[in-house]
Amino acid sequence: LMAEGAARACDSGADIVDINMGCPAKKVCRKAAGSALLSDPTLVIKILRAVVKASESPVTLKMRTGPNQVHKNGVTIAKIAESEGISAIAIHGRTRNCRYDVPAEYETIAAIKDSIGIPVLVNGDIRCGSSAFKALSKTNADGLMIGRAAQGNPWIFSSIRAALDGERWNEPSPIERLEVLHSLLESLYQLYGKEQGSRVARKHIIWFLSYLPIKSEINKATMNKIKTSHDQLNFVQFRKREFENKG
């Protein structure tokens, strides 16, 4: 099935095919998917071999450092990936069992980087320029992958790029953040339809609001009341006018 999906993705114009062996969610791991696959190197070989063979585009892999703290087999999985034709690997600095409950560690990623020749991207606890410097310096990785820290904050990429390049970067104003949120909501409604789109939009509104000088308890309480796409857009516009009036 994964090989078939890869072929379809390539036919649709995908630049890369990315295999996710990093997700620690229970509902995913219960189906022997995501980071649960790290416990079965033989199955990993079969999957990677099939997907690489079926894909006309480069195939990349996203993974964790291993199933648990005792069994960190990240180096083994990374070597398998390289031998099976994977073009690059993004590694999250936690095991499957750690989920997001402990700080990311970069020593295992550094060991993986030293053991293979394909590009390695470091992932985990990268939230700003200083944490990006730390992750890169500790791992000697070829690049960064940012996940949760981008929720509600798409500017994180330009801010980290500026920090790494030693350039000045200007924080977006609350008004600019709300304008981008408004545009995002309209795109969600167009993609999913207004009913489903409004449900998907709720978490994005909360994420964006977390970067504004508004009390979080007000955000959550308010979100329980604004359920329709019309109400959500009006709410964002109302918040925008508040900041405009403050000057």
What does each of the following model-derived ranges do?
Residues 1, 58, 63-76:
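Active-site glycine- and acidic-residue-rich loops that bind
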Residues 1-14, 36-43:
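Glycine-rich anion/phosphate-binding loops
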Residues 13-24:
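Short, flexible active-site-proximal loops enriched in glycine and acidic residues
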Residues 18-20, 60, 90, 145:
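Conserved beta-strand positions in the central sheet of alpha/beta enzyme cores
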Residues 22-24, 64-68, 94-96, 125-127, ...:
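Active-site beta-loop-alpha junctions enriched in small/polar residues
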Residues 26-43, 94-106, 167-168:
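Glycine-rich tight-turn/loop motif centered on a GG-T
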Residues 35-37, 44-54, 61-63, 69:
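Conserved beta-alpha-beta core of the PfkB/ribokinase-like small-molecule kinase fold
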Residues 46, 54, 70-88, 100, ...:
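Alpha/beta catalytic cores of nucleotide-metabolism and tRNA/nucleoside-modifying enzymes
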